[in-house]
């Protein structure tokens, strides 16, 4: 009996880290889905805000950048300020601040209230990204590439659902009550998170897990540039997509369907592009997806509404899937093995680019045409191809190590 009890105790001790790891990953994924859903759900409101507040394309992009730019610009300060805070506290704080921003936007405070609420919500999301990523890497150590892919994928689930729900509700409700409902959803997620996530991270080998390679600052710096351009393409196209659908005769509900199709394709693209990278390598897979992105974006300029809706899931695969390959490479190229700082820098690059790029593309459209703005976004993806080729000397050793780790991990 004593031997049996000892065996049960040993089994429980072995299973506890696995259970806690799954809880950590689930907590990070739920919060990531909410915040990414908040981020891209705002696209459904852009045509309404443009009409109500009489904004140009560039002005609309500036309003959008109040959220996106705040989220990107505060990545590093948020990472530094909350390094001594437990994962539960950091993710709860991120969610509650974002909820406060949506509550402010939902109040009848005019254009100034909308802008202030966007900034507050952006502050909350700036906390979530680096702290959620570090929670996953600390939990899984050297085997974090696959869980990071799951974490990255969870964001696309939020992108696929919240924008569609918002677009479906907007023909029925005014836009402020819809924002209020999104805030209520955030409170529900905060309650779930409070009972789910542990107060501390579950592994003590973060020093080992952080030092898994790293080809130097040159490789990491180029990776952040590539990530920024990839995000610029995506956010630039998303700026114009609602207006492209309206121009084809679609309504608000059709815009929601179009966004959902694009984001569902993007979620599927996370798995597809990781699979592709294992066969073509990171360099070959990124080159292929960026070339396809350029061609498909330009193709949507010449297709009717029905054909455009058919193309959007395919475009979503390559438009959004590339980021998963780039994101999974961050720990291997992290300067000095500091994955927390590396993720914060990478997010600053991609989110900052996502905030600035629509302003640039919007200005191009304002001074020429919407079509030229869309073409500019597509050509940005093509510009990534030679940069990825230049990344090869830095990326190859780290990527090989990561793939070996991923294939050997349970």
Regions flagged by a language model, labelled:
Residues 42-43, 218-270:
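Extracytoplasmic gate region of multi-pass secondary transporters
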Residues 74-86, 269-281, 365-366:
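Helix-to-loop junctions at the C-terminal end of transmembrane segments
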Residues 40, 68-76, 160, 263-271, ...:
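Residue-level signature of mid-helix packing/kink "hotspots" within the transmembrane helices
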Residues 117-155:
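Cytoplasmic helix-loop-helix junction between adjacent transmembrane helices
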Residues 337-367:
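A late C-terminal transmembrane helix in Major Facilitator Superfamily
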Residues 73-109:
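Conserved MFS/SLC helix-loop-helix module at the cytosolic interface between two early adjacent transmembrane helices
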Residues 183-205, 386-392:
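C-terminal membrane-cytosol helix-exit motif in multi-pass small-molecule transporters
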């Amino acid at each position: 009996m004593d031997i049996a009890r000892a065996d049960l105790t040993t089994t429980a001790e072995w299973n506890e880290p696995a259970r806690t790891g799954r809880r950590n990953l689930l907590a990070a994924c739920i919060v990531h889905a909410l915040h990414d859903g908040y981020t891209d759900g705002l696209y459904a409101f852009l045509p309404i805000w443009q009409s109500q507040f009489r904004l140009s394309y560039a002005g609309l992009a500036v309003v959008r950048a109040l959220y996106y730019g705040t989220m990107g610009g505060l990545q590093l300060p948020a990472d530094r300020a909350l390094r001594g805070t437990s994962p539960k506290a950091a993710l709860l704080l991120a969610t509650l601040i974002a909820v406060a921003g949506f509550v402010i936007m939902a109040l009848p405070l005019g254009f100034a209230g909308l802008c202030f609420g966007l900034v507050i919500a952006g502050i909350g999301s700036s906390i979530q990204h680096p702290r959620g990523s570090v929670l996953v890497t600390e939990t899984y150590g050297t085997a974090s590439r696959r869980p990071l892919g799951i974490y990255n994928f969870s964001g696309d689930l939020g992108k696929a659902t919240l924008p569609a729900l918002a677009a479906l509700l907007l023909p029925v409700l005014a836009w402020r009550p819809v924002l209020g409902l999104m805030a209520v959803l955030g409170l529900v997620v905060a309650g779930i998170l409070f009972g789910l996530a542990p107060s501390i991270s579950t592994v003590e080998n973060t020093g080992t897990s952080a030092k898994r390679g790293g080809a130097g600052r040159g490789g990491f710096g180029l990776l952040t540039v590539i990530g920024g351009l990839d995000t610029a393409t995506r956010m630039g196209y998303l700026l114009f997509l609602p207006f492209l659908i309206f121009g084809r005769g679609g309504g608000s509900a059709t815009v929601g369907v179009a966004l959902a199709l694009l984001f569902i394709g993007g979620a599927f693209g996370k798995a597809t592009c990781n699979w592709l990278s294992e066969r073509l390598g990171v360099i070959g897979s990124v080159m292929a997806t960026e070339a396809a992105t350029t061609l498909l974006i330009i193709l949507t300029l010449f297709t009717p509404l029905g054909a455009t809706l058919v193309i959007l899931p395919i475009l979503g695969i390559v438009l959004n899937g590339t980021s998963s390959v780039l994101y999974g490479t961050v720990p291997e190229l992290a300067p000095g093995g500091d994955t927390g700082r590396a993720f914060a820098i990478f997010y600053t690059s991609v989110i900052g680019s996502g905030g600035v790029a629509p302003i640039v593309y919007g200005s191009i459209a304002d001074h020429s045409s919407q079509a030229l703005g869309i073409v500019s976004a597509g050509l940005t993806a093509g510009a990534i191809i030679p940069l990825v080729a230049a990344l090869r000397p830095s990326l190859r050793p780290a990527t090989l190590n990561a793939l070996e780790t991923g294939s050997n991990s349970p």
